[in-house]
Amino acid sequence: MRRVASLAAVVVALTIQPALADDTGAPGDTPAVEGSVMQGADAQGQVYVPADFARYAPRNAYDMLTQVPGFSIRDNDEVRGLGQATGNVLFNGTRPSTKSDDIYTLLTRIPAANVERIEIVDGAGLDIPGLSGQVANLVFRADSFSGQFSWKPQARPHYTDPLLTRGDISVRGRKGTVEYELGLNNDDSSRSGAGGPTVITNGAGEVIERRKDIWNTHQDSPKVSARLTWDPKGDSIAHLGAHYQRKYYHYDEDGYWVAPGLPDRIRTIRETQDTWNYELSGDYQFGLGPGKLKLIGLRRVSHEPYTQEVVLAPVDGSAAVGDRFSQVGDVGETIGRGEYQWPMLGGDWEISGEAAFNTLDNVSRLYSLDPLSGDFVEEPFPEGSGGVSEDRYEAMLSFGRKLTDRLSFQLTGGAEHSTLTQTGMSGLERSFFRPKGSLTLSWTPEQGVDLSLKIKRRVRQLDFYDFLARAFLGDGNNNSGNNELRPQQEWRYEFEGNMSLGKWGSTKVQLVYVDAEDFVDIVPVGAGESVGNIPKAWAAAAVVSATINLDPAGLKGVRIDASVDLETSSLRDPFTGRKRQWSGFQDSYAEVALRHDIPGSDWAWGLNANYAHYQPNYRRNETNRTWEGPVFASVFVENKDVLGMTVRAQLSNAVNARSRRERTVYEGVRGASPVLFHESRDRLIGPIFVFSVRGKF
């Protein structure tokens, strides 16, 4: 099923803090640090140096960047291939060529002592196509050797085992013209769980079954990574990166079901997904003619076995019923990309070409439990196995320049040609040609105010598993597979306005509108249903966020961060013909946070609360709204110098957010047939105790 997160995914939960900074950037007679994107006396933007963050005792670049007033980190979108830049963080004036490491991971590996400065500039004014709005350029150096570590255990009193394995350690340094970085990271680990009652009612509202279910998960994702940078004298620079990762995911659910006229039953669900993946990436940039040429290569491979088993066993000893679904997928991606940049006609030009080859080879099996032998017996399931591949070629040309001292633009245009091939039971080959590009305008009407407008045409990446059939045993659903699935295309319109409030902080307004074609959702396929395309859909969002520094009011060291996100969407339901919102769409979000760094001490404390509301997910015969909340709140206390380390204790879920579900299943098409049953779930999560230790060596 398609999982649609917030349209305003560009807005990350704010944890930013006002700091003292130069609003005018570096003076013209000050040599720019190598890697700077602010060159010359006419450079516009804000510059933050390490002294601006001293009160927070940051351990790494992430700690520093999250304190910049009015700036929210936006990670790179999940795009086809490498494409043009989509995030809003640069590293020494360049964007990373890896797809596996998010911005958070890259920033946390850079010790705060290595950061020279942070430049907040207008993305459209840079010579990197795809950027718009506020962009942070992190200018840093490598020491001869430095290292850092963190450990973030967690404990819950209900249904969940303690988490003791979350943490990371990394080292980086420099030897002559070579910088190196090594890391071991298991931050993407978790222990989760919840338990409580579920009530099943019929169409008349009468209780027909009561359940008590408890579930918990274990997840660990250790990853070892290495990165080399060769930076000789001159205009050449090269990067080489690699990682290897194992992922271990286990889900266990045990339920006791009671229904009139039936023996009590015990239901168990067991899911296992133990995978591995690796990535090799590199780039080399050098001067050529009037400009510079950058060559990029990347190879990713992932082995992804998955098993789900569901058994319903009566306690009176009568025969149990059950099913098992398993699949083994092997995913590969190979990308080659070239970018040539040069100045001409008073602006910056770039021509780029990219070839990307994606593959999936998958084998699925379906079993049912034999009531006599108690063994799982395989059933025919040929539509779940097969291969999917896409060969894609892209060419783009971009041009950007300043129109006035306060107005700049960037124009990008091009197209892609792709061939989608499916093998197996429903083999099919199709080819597509799609134009794409963007126009960005940026205006700074006065100091402390910057506005940007971006219009973008893009093509979304497909999940190759959606081409093949799959069973979802927990709810008794299945996708029949769809060999005619097409990538979603969309026009995206984004407005961003940032205004400095001086010593009081800053505020930001974002407006987003998406006009989508071939929208990906669950649609009728043959006699069943599967992931497919809806001709038209749209969504809109308005986001207002602010950082308020209360130092001028006499509350030294106190700041408040707040954001409100309101969204709406629309499409014509492929089953009912009626208009509705997108499946699983986040239509509202609000967050407020308070942090107090106590002056003259190493102590800090804070509060945070957030609320989110989601639309239901839709299938042919059901609606399903699953959420946690309504409000998540946390409180923390932190000391920034415990034997040279930063130590934090935090209580999360302080106001008892619950795990909820409201699911209605119909006899036929929802809304056009009687209700078969309604499922109402209310499970306890309980408080979460989080502890963290961060240090360096």
Task: Please provide the spans of the model-predicted regions.
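Short, acidic, small-residue-rich periplasmic hinge/interaction motif at the N-terminus
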Residues: A21-A54, R74-N76, L82-T86
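Gram-negative outer-membrane beta-barrel transporters
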Residues: L511-D515, G532-R619
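C-terminal beta-signal and adjacent terminal beta-strands/loops
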Residues: N639-F697
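Outer-membrane beta-barrel signature, preferentially recognizing the C-terminal barrel domain
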Residues: I269-N277, G329, G386-V388, R430, ...
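Transmembrane beta-barrel wall of Gram-negative outer-membrane proteins
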Residues: Y159-A194, E206-D252, T272-L288, G437-L439
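N-terminal periplasmic accessory domains that precede
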Residues: A61-M64, I103-L106, G130-P153, T165-G167
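Short acidic/polar hinge/loop motifs at secondary-structure boundaries
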Residues: R95-D122, A226
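Extracytoplasmic beta-strand/coil segments of soluble accessory domains associated
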Residues: Y62-T98, G123, D127, S132, ...
